[in-house]
Amino acid sequence: VTAPVPVDAAELVARALRAAIAGLDDPVAAGLKISTQVGRGRDGGPPSRPWLLVAEDAHSWRWPAVQSATIRLTAWHHTEHDAKRVAGLVLGALCDRATAAATPGLLLAEPDSAPLSDVDPYTGEPLAFATAVVTIRTPIRS
């Protein structure tokens, strides 16, 4: 029996971003770790910086073929400015049509909010976040 199976949107975006930023020549992105998890560091924060958390805030599925998800990109860095810059870089990379073309299943990504900087209330470390809405083709699996 074959059936459409929803995709883990956060993991798909994390894979797409790892590939998209691999060739990025920007010192603020040097050593950036991209993950769908955080919480193993001090006070529940990331284990290292710079760190990008890819999380899913909302998800809908237009059965059987298309999913839509709101993705939150949270960047921790050494300064609020650098965190905001990383959030902007990865948001731009995600919304670049070349990223969708290079990522099987990712049809489109559009910005939902611009990067905003803040301080992590749990760790006191600088962070920034942005959101994007992604459209994903749902694969058929047997």
Predicted regions and their residues:
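Structural beta->alpha junctions
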Residues: 73-79
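Small/polar-rich, solvent-exposed N-terminal microdomains that initiate assembly or binding
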Residues: 1-62, 101
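Short, charged interaction patches at domain edges and termini
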Residues: 1-19, 57-66, 105-142
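Short, solvent-exposed beta-strand edge segments and adjacent coil->beta transition regions
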Residues: 68-72
